[in-house]
């Protein structure tokens, strides 16, 4: 599997909406698309307008699998970017 970054800007009104989306995303990945999509982590962004966005790290067969996952889970996918390499300076907090 390849690693990807997915940008989801201003997609949620509040933390409760984000939690609901995360639960559905996990369900779709684990139950409907096992072996095709693997959610690694997300960084939550507070947008200027007060909404929440995310920078999500996934592993997937390809970008098409991530687009299908987003569609099934009802998630936006503003941008899907393949990761070329990783430079680790410090472990994540």
Report residues per predicted region:
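A short, glycine/Asx- and small/polar-enriched loop/turn
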Residues: 49-52
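Conserved short beta-strand edge segments in small beta-sheet-based binding/regulatory domains
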Residues: 75-87
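Short S/T/G/P-rich N-terminal loop/turn motif that feeds into the first structured element of a domain
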Residues: 1-47, 63, 68-69, 87-93
């Amino acid at each position: 599997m390849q690693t990807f970054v997915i940008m989801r800007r201003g997609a949620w009104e509040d933390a409760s909406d984000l939690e609901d989306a995360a639960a559905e995303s996990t369900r779709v990945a684990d139950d409907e698309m096992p072996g095709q999509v693997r959610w690694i982590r997300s960084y939550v962004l507070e947008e200027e307008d007060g909404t929440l966005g995310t920078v999500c790290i996934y592993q997937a067969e390809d970008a098409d699998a991530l687009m299908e996952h987003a569609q099934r889970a009802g998630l936006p996918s503003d941008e899907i970017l393949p990761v070329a390499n990783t430079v680790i300076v410090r472990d994540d907090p």
